[in-house]
Structures are given as C-alpha cells and as structure tokens.
Amino acid sequence: MKLILKETISTLGREGDLIDVKAGYGRNYLLPQGKAVLATATNVAELEKNQAEIQAKIAKETAIAEKVAEKLQAINLVIEQLAGDDGRLFGSVTNSDICAALAAQDIVLDKRQIILPDPIKTVSETPVLIKVGFQVATEVVVKVVPLSTKA
C-alpha cells in the first residue's frame, strides 16, 4: 500500500515521504490516526506543489534538533542517588530520572527520546544515547554519584 506521510515517523520516514507499507498497517493505524494519506494522483500532485514548504519545515526542525544536540554535548549531567558502600544503588537511574535532571538544566525532552537499554544500577559514568530529532542523536555521559548525606 503506497502512502504519503503527513508527519515524521522515526521508523518510516519524514513528512512528505512516499512510503510503501503493508495494507493492514496502513489501513488500521496510519490512515485512521491521520499520520498518512493514500498516494493517489491528486495527493501526489498536492505533495509536489507543497514540496518546498515541507523541505523548509524539515530544515528548520533539523536545525533545532542539531542545536539541542550541541547543547546536550556541552552539558555535565550528574545524578545523585543513595548507594551502598559497594557502589550499588538503592534503586536505579532510569530514563525518567535523566529526563528530570535535564529539565533542571532547562532542556526539556520526552523520556522516550532517551535510549537507555537497562537502568543504571551502580555508581558510574555511563554513556546514554539521546534522540533529539529524526536521524539526529547525541551521546551524553551520565555520572551517577552517591548521595552525600550530612549527619
């Protein structure tokens, strides 16, 4: 089934891309959700007419994503957690915790943009992949330190 994407979907393509998907996926998900339209002759002609506008929008989104990626690379992310003497954490650091730490430094991201295969369970420096846009990602080192308790 040939469709034209109305918005960027990370697994399929960018807005305005002509894609070929299985009929069930297109009919049951993409079309009802308004994420795509059928690639009829009139829709393809409309796409070609709006191509310059779509390309400008994509360029703007990419520029914003690259600025955020540069800002993330310059950041020093330190998260304090309760830890035992052996360096293991009581609990773990998840992508939600990383998202909250970034929000404290005025970088607002969705927790789904932070790719963390497993929660961090030890005091360590761990590289974490953050997807800030379509095919724009950066790696941030998250330093987990023991919470300093003052008696």
Swiss-Prot record:
Entry's family note: Belongs to the bacterial ribosomal protein bL9 family.
A biological process term (GO) from this entry: translation
Known function: Binds to the 23S rRNA.
Gene source species: Desulfotalea psychrophila (strain LSv54 / DSM 12343)
GO annotation, cellular component aspect: ribonucleoprotein complex; ribosome
GO MF entry, a single one: structural constituent of ribosome
Keyword RNA-binding: yes
One Pfam entry name: Ribosomal_L9_N
Cross-referenced InterPro entries: Ribosomal_bL9, Ribosomal_bL9/RNase_H1_N, Ribosomal_bL9_bac/chp, Ribosomal_bL9_C, Ribosomal_bL9_C_sf, Ribosomal_bL9_N, Ribosomal_bL9_N_sf
Protein name: Large ribosomal subunit protein bL9
Keywords in alphabetical order: Ribonucleoprotein, Ribosomal protein, RNA-binding, rRNA-binding
PANTHER family: 50S RIBOSOMAL PROTEIN L9
